C-alpha cells in the first residue's frame, strides 16, 4: 500500500501507486475532517511552512487498508527529516511500520540525523540527492556546509 504525504507527496504517491498497478493509495491530510480521531494526528513542522502549527492526520477509515500490509511512504522531498519523522510517528500510532520511505529528492544531509535518532534511517530511498543551499551575502547561493 502506498501512503502519500501532503502536499506534493500526494501526486507523487498516486503516480507510484498507479505505476505499481494499485487501484488506490492512502493519503495523509493536514485538514481535520469531522470524523477524524485527534489521537491519530501529529504536529507537523516543515521548512516550507515554518511556524504555521499544522497537524498531520491519518483517516481512521484507512486503517483496515494498512493493517498487515507492506506499506511504502512517498514524499516529494526529505530535507531536515522532521516532516517524515512526524509521518512515521503518525503511522506508528495506527500500528503501521512502513518497509520503505521513498522521496523524489533527498536534500542535504540533515535528515540523516533526525531519522537516525528515530531508528528510520535504513528505510529511506530517494530518486536523486542534492545539497541544501544557503544564501550568500551577495545574494547568490552556495551549498550548505
Mark where each language-model region is.
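Short glycine-rich phosphate-binding loop at a beta-alpha junction
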Residues: 1-6
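Short, ordered loop/turn segments at secondary-structure junctions
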Residues: 7, 30-32, 107, 129
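Short, well-ordered alpha-helical microsegments
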Residues: 9-13, 109-112
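Glycine-rich SAM-binding Motif I of class I
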Residues: 10, 81, 85
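Short Gly/Thr/Asp-enriched flexible loops that form oxyanion-binding sites at enzyme active sites
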Residues: 11-20, 88
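Short, glycine/charge-rich flexible loops or terminal/linker lids adjacent to PRPP-binding catalytic cores
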Residues: 21-71, 141-144
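DG-centered beta-turn motif at the end of beta-strands
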Residues: 75-77, 81
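PRPP-dependent phosphoribosyltransferase catalytic core
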Residues: 85-145
Amino acid at each position: 500500500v502506498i501512503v502519500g504525504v501532503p502536499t506534493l507527496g500526494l501526486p507523487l504517491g498516486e503516480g507510484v501507486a498507479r505505476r505499481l498497478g494499485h487501484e488506490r493509495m492512502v493519503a495523509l491530510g493536514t485538514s481535520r475532517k469531522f470524523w477524524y480521531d485527534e489521537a491519530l494526528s501529529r504536529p507537523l513542522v516543515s521548512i516550507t511552512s515554518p511556524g504555521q502549527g499544522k497537524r498531520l492526520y491519518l483517516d481512521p477509515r484507512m486503517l483496515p487498508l494498512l493493517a498487515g500490509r507492506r506499506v511504502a511512504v512517498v514524499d516529494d522531498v526529505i530535507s531536515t527529516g522532521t516532516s517524515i519523522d512526524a509521518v512515521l510517528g503518525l503511522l506508528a500510532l495506527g500500528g503501521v511500520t512502513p518497509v520503505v520511505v521513498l522521496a523524489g529528492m533527498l536534500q542535504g544531509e540533515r535528515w540523516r540525523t533526525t531519522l537516525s535518532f528515530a531508528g528510520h534511517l535504513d528505510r529511506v530511498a530517494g530518486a536523486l540527492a542534492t545539497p541544501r543551499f544557503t544564501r550568500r551575502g551577495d545574494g547568490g547561493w552556495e551549498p550548505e556546509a
